[in-house]
Design a protein with these regions (language model features):
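Cytochrome P450
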Residues: 1-226
Length: 226
């Protein structure tokens, strides 16, 4: 199912659609900066980085403006915590809390398509021509909204930190704005938001001369590769 769902989602996020979102992003950045510029300071993560990611995907998906602040608060809540008592308990999952709202959006798009990502999602088809059931649509819509939120906001925040510590880079990028994509790429490589990933070996294997037994938990350090 993962491959089917990935193919379905990939068909929605086309280069043309993302390009059309650029003008909105420019206006969004100015709007967010206007909110704190007169103060002379801000908490860059919630006030700019996190807000940028939430509002950007909200615009692509066609989420009403009046609901975006609610979703920003929900997705920005502290991560779920595992309690130390038994039986095992975890904190609230923001994607679960969002389900009623997203279900309402999807029902509306089924009846009234609007040309946004959610409208395309509810009318999307798998490769064999079948349609996702409603629960699958709900899960995919919330996944689309939440995917990349944390990593993107961290990348934005790290980029701001680097520029704050390197006035020379600020001046260079102002003089050579065509180098901004290179700066973003290098920030992602040098101090990316995802440091490690974990994998479970399902069978005996080897990496080079290192034997790895089935059941071994592996830690993949992306920073080491950079």
């Amino acid at each position: 199912k993962h491959a089917e769902h990935r193919m379905l989602m990939g068909s929605l996020l086309t280069f043309k659609r993302l390009k059309q979102n650029e003008e909105y992003l420019h206006g969004l950045s100015e709007m967010l900066i206007d909110r704190f510029i007169d103060k002379g300071s801000c908490d860059i993560v919630p006030e700019f980085a996190h807000a940028t990611t939430v509002y950007a995907i909200s615009d692509l998906m066609g989420i009403p403006m009046e609901d975006r602040a609610i979703l920003l608060e929900q997705i920005g809540a502290p991560p779920s915590q595992v309690q130390g008592d038994a039986p095992l308990k975890v904190g609230p999952d923001p994607l679960v809390a969002m389900k009623p709202l997203f279900d309402a959006y999807l029902h509306d798009r089924l009846a009234n398509p609007r040309g946004d990502l959610m409208s395309e999602l509810v009318h999307a088809r798998f490769k064999d021509g079948t349609s996702p059931d409603f629960d699958t649509l709900s899960n995919l819509a919330r996944f689309l909204f939440g995917a990349g939120q944390d990593t993107t906001s961290r990348l934005i925040a790290m980029g701001v930190l680097v520029l704050g510590e390197r006035p020379d880079l600020q001046e260079r990028l102002r003089a050579e704005p065509d180098r901004i994509p290179d700066f973003i790429e290098e920030t992602l490589r040098y101090d990316g938001p995802v440091k490690v990933a974990y994998r479970l070996a399902t069978r005996d294997t080897a990496i080079g001369d290192l034997a790895i037994a089935a059941g071994t938990i592996l830690t993949v350090c992306y920073a080491a590769a950079s």
